[in-house]
Amino acid sequence: MLAKPRPLDHIGDADDGVAAKAAGLDALYGHLKPLEIIERSARELFHDEIAAVSSFGADSAVLLHMIAEIDRTLPVIFLDTGKHFEETLGYRDALVADFGLTNIQVIKPEEAALARIDPTGNLHQSNTDACCDVRKVEPLARGVAPFRAWFTGRKRFQASTRAALPVFEAVGARIRINPLAHWTTSDQADYMRAHALRENPLVAYGYLSIGCFPCTQPVQPGEDARSGRWAGHAKTECGIHLSGLEVSLTDASL
């Protein structure tokens, strides 16, 4: 049984801004179990103004299964970059069927932007940041625009850059929620096994973090899960989890 909720508006004065609200939420609810965080956020804090963002990658099944336990109609945003592995697209469809998710929102890059910025489809070979901007960051800004908050499946163990990841964090005027932030690899594996959740088939081939096929490769023993992303480049995040998304939201006046 969840404790009596504390209204979101009472967490930090209006002048404190969204960052203070996120910090307040993290202090109040960040210690809860992931399912409780999802339930509290979806049913009490943000109601119909919250979504989930999923890559349907290596670790996606757990968060989506938990969301389905709470509300199968909750919007799930999927960025169709045009560069996904076929296995990922098949996995997406399989999980949607497994969990009975009914509100998958597929967001794609704008055709005009691709024609202007990446007309040959080879931008990833010369400028990975620009490629991620047009195929991920800007589309996600459009996808989350109608919502006040969204869930992600990010975890601290995935990379050194995520070691201090909070459960609740501010992104411009919105709040991003990472219910699984404090989970370990064992927590992930135990949940997958306990609920007989299927894996992305690429995991069996050493892909422990899965993005677009041109910029993803198997992880070597001893490396962190995201070391196979943009290998050979000084890059560990696509931008949707960094300041790039906040800039895109601001630029779009959302």
UniProtKB/Swiss-Prot annotation:
> Which pathway, metabolic or otherwise, does it act in?
Sulfur metabolism; hydrogen sulfide biosynthesis; sulfite from sulfate
Q: Which GO terms describe its biological process?
A: hydrogen sulfide biosynthetic process; sulfate assimilation, phosphoadenylyl sulfate reduction by phosphoadenylyl-sulfate reductase (thioredoxin)
Q: By its UniProt entry, which SUPFAM superfamilies does this protein fall under?
A: Adenine nucleotide alpha hydrolases-like (SSF52402)
- Please tell me which top-level EC class this enzyme sits in: oxidoreductase
Gene Ontology CC = cytoplasm
Localization, per the record, is: Cytoplasm
Sorted keywords for this record are:
Cytoplasm, Iron, Iron-sulfur, Metal-binding, Oxidoreductase
Disulfide cross-links: none
Q: How is the cofactor bound?
A: Binds 1 [4Fe-4S] cluster per subunit.
Q: What Enzyme Commission number does this protein have?
A: 1.8.4.10
PANTHER family noted in UniProt: PHOSPHOADENOSINE PHOSPHOSULFATE REDUCTASE
Please name the HAMAP family in this protein's record. Answer: CysH
The name this protein goes by in its record:
Adenosine 5'-phosphosulfate reductase
